[in-house]
Amino acid sequence: MDRETFNRWLASYGSAWTGRDPGAAASLYADDATYQVTPFDEPLRGRAAIYEYWSGVARTEEKIQFEYEILAVTAEHGIARWWASFVRVPPGLATKLDGIFLISLDSAGRCRSLREWWHKRQ
């Protein structure tokens, strides 16, 4: 992986999230990708499961903002810090997240694995 590819993937991830587009989000992942939302949850497995997860996000979050900063890129992984804010619906609860991604991409630039650690303030 190189920095440019990782940056492009993160920008596309942010666009899919802020655009509330589960299809665009799922298209960023390999067919057999894993997505671990928190370190204590079992990872989602496969693009269909990731699509279902992002469908829920699209239904329950509005006014989404997303930013990121690349911290490191190796041949195997990219690490980024990210920030997001949104309004959870219902009940209209303002939410801020601050997190870290550990991401592995395949040769086509699709995510093979994503692990994240984040904190929430509401």
Residue ranges of model-derived segments:
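Short hydrophobic/aromatic segments of transmembrane alpha-helices and their interfaces
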Residues: 32-34, 94
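A beta-strand edge to alpha-helix "cap/lid" segment located at domain peripheries
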Residues: 2-5, 21, 51-122
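Structured beta->alpha junctions
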Residues: 14, 39, 70-72
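Short, low-complexity N-terminal intrinsically disordered segments enriched in polar/charged residues
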Residues: 1-31
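A short gly/proline-enriched turn/hairpin at secondary-structure junctions
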Residues: 34-45, 56-59, 117
